[in-house]
């Protein structure tokens, strides 16, 4: 079940913090060995309404997760981040541009409207996509070849 993200919920708790001090900005994205494979976790969570910071972090990490040696399985963790049209466009560009073929892409924490927009943009580009409420089910789906 997807619930529309309440913008006030994500702005009230971080109003007193400088954007560079947010946990989501400091959190590193990484490769996780799991069930005999590897998954790239792109952590864009906890950045709240600071879309430009989310995009900057995504652009820095794109150079890493698009390397030929990087995993073809990727999870975008978007909890506690306002998902804007601009962020959706940046995610799509990172996944679609030539040079790296992804096998499966999971999204964790996306609201219903963002899910629809991402599906519309990413459908038919040669990789499976699915949306989850938590990281554990996303990990299981990414590396379970029977669930395509």
Name every feature range the model reports, one short phrase each.
Residues 2-148:
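Amphipathic, Lys/Arg-enriched alpha-helical "gate/interface" segment within cytosolic domains
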């Amino acid at each position: 079940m997807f619930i529309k993200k309440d913008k006030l919920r994500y702005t009230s708790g971080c109003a007193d913090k400088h954007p560079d001090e947010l946990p989501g900005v400091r959190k590193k994205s990484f490769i996780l060995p799991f069930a005999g494979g590897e998954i790239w976790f792109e952590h864009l969570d906890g950045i709240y309404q600071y879309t430009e910071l989310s995009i900057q972090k995504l652009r820095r990490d794109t150079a890493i997760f698009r390397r030929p040696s990087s995993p073809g399985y990727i999870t975008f963790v978007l909890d506690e981040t306002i998902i804007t049209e601009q962020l959706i466009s940046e995610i799509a560009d990172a996944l679609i541009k030539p040079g790296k073929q992804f096998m499966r892409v999971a999204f964790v924490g996306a609201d219903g409207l963002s899910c629809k927009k991402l599906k519309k943009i990413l459908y038919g580009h040669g990789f499976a996509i699915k949306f989850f409420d938590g990281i554990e089910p996303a990990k299981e789906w990414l590396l379970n070849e029977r669930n395509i």
